[in-house]
Amino acid sequence: MKAHKIFSIKVFCSIILFLSHNLIYCASEDPIYGKNGMVVSTSNEASLVGVNILKKGGNAIDAAVAVGFALAVTSSGNGNIGGGGFLVARMASGASFTLDHREAAPKKSKRDMFLNSNGNVIPGMSLGTRASSGVPGTVDGLLRVFYDYGSGSV
């Protein structure tokens, strides 16, 4: 019985792997390379916003910020202003930087705010109440990187 179960699991995993073959690899079998820059996102409209920024003399940071805000409108499930993120960048000068603009706990949050007087977790308190909210970091992060590393020309 046990050997049959293991065999069934192996067959199931093999089928899933076979069916997900197209999901594992890139959408195009022939990679596309840009000669003067490239903008890629989950939304054609948002990518075009970034391309237009580059054409107007903006740098990659300007384009990334514009795409980030455009995604909040054109592809809100993939880019939104109610969350946060991470940015890793290398500028043309060779300088690199990172920015953590993830959501943060509200300022009045306390380390033990989800615990009762005995120090035990209050069930559901950290999931389904106003106390469980976080402060989005997307807008602050995009604006901060724009002002600190943008070209200043758009």
Where are these regions (language model features)?
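N-terminal secretory signal peptides that target proteins for export/translocation
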Residues: 1-7
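Short linear motifs in intrinsically disordered/low-complexity regions
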Residues: 5, 22-23, 117
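Bacterial N-terminal signal peptides
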Residues: 10-22
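Noncatalytic scaffold domains of N-terminal-nucleophile
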Residues: 26-48, 52, 60-154
